[in-house]
Amino acid sequence: MDLHLDENLSTMDSLMHHYILIAILVASIIAMVVSSYGREHPLSKVPLVTEKSFWDFTGKKARDNFAANARAVIKQGFAKVGASKPFRIISDQGEMLILPPALAHDIRNVDALSHAEFMKDTTCAEVPGFEPYLESTGTTLLTDMTKTKLMSAMKWLTTPLSNSVAKSCRDLFPEDDEWHEVVLKDKLLDLIARLSSVIFLGEEEIREDPAWLRITKEYTVDSFIASHQLRPYPRYLRPFIARFLPQAQKVQAQLREAEAIITPVIERRRAEKAASTTTVERYDSIEWLEQVAEEKGIKYSPAAMQLTLALSAIHTTTDLLTTTMYEILQHPETIQLLRDEVASVVGDGRLKHSSLYNLKLMDSVIKEAQRLKPVLSINMVRMATEDIDLPDGLNIPRGTRLGVSSHASWDPKVFPNPEKFDPYRFVRLREQPGEENVWQLTTTRPEQIAFGHGQHACPGRFLAANEVKIALCHLLLKYDWELSSITMPTAISHGIMLDSDPTVKVNVRSRQSEVVL
């Protein structure tokens, strides 16, 4: 009798939850309709180029179209309003104001245009399981650590990074002279995950823990999917909706697993530090984060912050390396040119920090690949925290989401023959008087904003550039490569993200290196 009663009560509770959810959703839809059609838009003078139909009152159709065709939507927008004019779109992240590249310099250092607030809104940082996004936006800890600790340690990291790539290559690629077919991006993701763990976790054994490496690769993708599913709902509803969303539950489980792996390491280190009278120098993010947090009095979650680092570094660096390899393999004459440069610069086989700077052709090749296929079609994303007036007279109301189009990278007025891969393009630009440092891979400017521009430019771009160069030195000198299909790699649009093709297969075999790295 009691068993049946419990079952009935459980069923009633379940039904009640569903009824409450449906009621909230209906109320939210009504609120969105009233909001959409009941008042004048504060940016009504700026054209909306992706008008939604009356029946698409949630904007789902417009959002889905942008998610799949963002680059085309942006191109059509500028075709309608003119290359130097802003416009509005319905993106997969809601309505956005799209600025032309010419305005990148004007907004680069405006404090009231907040990158953190944009990320909080679009990444569902307030939802349990998404704490790594909250860690990246709630404090300056990550940026401070990168700028003060990581940057000063860069010159010491080249050798351990090179050693890590050498070991990873032996594990991931063949050591015989027979051709082997592999899915390139999968292998490079494994390589960068292992390489990044050298910086993140130092000499800790968990840096090679298969479970940890799996989480660092999967959390980014799974949380991206979950946030995409949650984003259409109002922010106050997202934590509630996440309870019923399998993808959000998966993300929460990954964070718990990460905490179980990282927490014992943090506790051991803190105990050792408390018991010791001497300071042990460690060159890894665990130590640097602890130091900066203590200096600035910042409380943080070590596990969430390690996943924040993975979010910030692993997939974006993998994408840059993959994009560069695709361009090199489509222009195989570039391979020997790069090998010759590496052999010339690293004659003794010792890859040093200064060696990376002197690989100027390689720097140009990477930047050219990034120019052709940046990781974002809209960059410098911000949310206005107060009303802003730009020098051109444009008023940006508080609460506006905005970003700058990356299309200057393909502008023939800026880059002649922009559709052509030119490995020496940036070598020549750097040879112009006074332009030596202006066109380096890590330098940002309105014409190329792949790393952002201004005060929110990617602080980790110097590490990413070094990692890609170190990886290319090993990959090109130690192996022969060729595309195994006549099908050329095609960038895939996921909203404002331009993802390098994850399906491309290549043939690889071992070769005799010009120098022993």
UniProtKB/Swiss-Prot annotation:
Glycosylation site residues: 8
SUPFAM superfamilies linked: Cytochrome P450 (SSF48264)
Enzyme class name: oxidoreductase
GO annotation (BP), single: mycotoxin biosynthetic process
Use in biotech settings: Calbistrin A has been reported to possess a number of interesting bioactivities including antifungal active against Candida albicans and cytotoxic toward both healthy and leukemic human cells.
Family: Belongs to the cytochrome P450 family.
Name this protein carries in UniProt: Cytochrome P450 monooxygenase calE
Provenance organism: Penicillium decumbens
Taxonomic path: Eukaryota, Fungi, Dikarya, Ascomycota, Pezizomycotina
